[in-house]
């Protein structure tokens, strides 16, 4: 059984037992988090939401809060001696999918 959930402005296909990385959620490590925006549930019986499936939830356990690899953004304007260098690390949350309730 699998489901498609929406979190952080993205749609993610998940299965039970799968580990996923999502945009940072405001929860502590070890807590459980429930996704209510389930767009699709597949498996033996298929349920398609319009826009979400009524009563369907996906429960996950928070494994880790972290930050991704650093990217460097460098901008400049030619012949003007104007340049700027910035770094960015995107925060994320690592989850393990426990149960898909449909």
Curated annotation (Swiss-Prot):
The terms under GO molecular function for this entry are:
rRNA binding; structural constituent of ribosome
The beginning of the lineage is: Bacteria, Bacillati, Bacillota, Bacilli, Bacillales
Coiled-coil portions: none
Q: What does this protein do?
A: This protein binds to 23S rRNA in the presence of protein L20.
What ranges does the record give for the region Disordered, renumbered to this chain? 80-102
Per UniProt, subunit arrangement is:
Part of the 50S ribosomal subunit. Contacts protein L20.
Q: Give the protein's recorded name.
A: Large ribosomal subunit protein bL21
Gene name of this polypeptide: rplU
Task: State the similarity comment.
Answer: Belongs to the bacterial ribosomal protein bL21 family.
Q: Which organism is it from?
A: Staphylococcus aureus (strain NCTC 8325 / PS 47)
Query: Pfam families from the entry?
Result: Ribosomal_L21p (PF00829)
Kindly list the GO CC terms recorded for this protein. cytoplasm; ribonucleoprotein complex; ribosome
One Gene Ontology term of the biological-process aspect is:
translation
> Which keywords are on file for this protein?
Ribonucleoprotein, Ribosomal protein, RNA-binding, rRNA-binding
Q: Where is the composition biased (Basic residues)?
A: 80-91
């Amino acid at each position: 059984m699998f489901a498609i959930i929406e979190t952080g402005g993205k749609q993610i296909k998940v299965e039970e037992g799968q580990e996923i990385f999502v945009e940072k959620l405001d929860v502590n490590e070890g807590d459980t988090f429930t996704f209510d925006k389930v767009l699709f549930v597949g498996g033996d019986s298929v349920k398609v939401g319009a826009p979400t499936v009524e009563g369907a939830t996906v429960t996950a356990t928070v494994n880790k809060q972290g930050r991704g690899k650093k990217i460097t953004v460098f901008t400049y304007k030619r012949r003007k001696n104007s340049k700027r260098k910035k770094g960015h690390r995107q925060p994320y949350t690592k989850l393990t999918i426990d149960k898909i309730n449909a």
